[in-house]
Amino acid sequence: MSDFVEIYEVGPRDGLQTEKRLIPTAAKVALIDLLSQTGFRRIEVASFVSPKWVPQMADSAEVMAQIHRVPGVRYTALTPNLRGFDAAKAAGADEVAIFGSASEGFSRANLNAGIAESLERFAPVAAAAKAAGIALRGYVSCVSDCPYDGPIAPGAVASVVAALRDIGCAEISLGDTIGRATPDRIDAMLMAVLNELPAGQLAVPPSATPATRPRRWRQCWQKKGFSPV
């Protein structure tokens, strides 16, 4: 097991985006400022998506303008398209993230596009990030199970990881989106993914059901070089 584990904090974005009650901008800023004092080196604070689809993130530019930035902390934003990237860049994002899926059904439901089309959409974002010298991170959802398509083949996950790697993602987070994976399924998926990207460039978010969480994550930590996020 690695002696170093980095925790990448996503609460201000992923944790808040589905809240039905609109949270005041000042409260979001206060949360991020507190997190900035805890020792996190990277915090995902905003999502530059259409407010029609994610109203909670409509004030992302204001949030990024008002936070008190701590030296050594990188503030990240989710940017699904070039318009979102341009807004994140203008807001001073230190890093941007794009998100895809290993499931066709989930991709169409959440991105209104199949896997291949969604990856094509990300290419201009990746190119713009590279030109601007802004680090690019990738997310892959449904790496084990999908609410629409059921179990996902390890090769399908590896294929999306390879595509995100090829367009410039320096790190890729593997999401067990609905928390149904088992240790054996995770192991098979990781073995396929590790053929495309080294462990040091992969992250694993701790989503799980209470019954599977302890066994799953003991096994993940044994994969040298993984960082939880």
Model regions and ranges:
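Catalytic cores and adjacent flexible loops of soluble metabolic enzymes
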Residues: 1-229
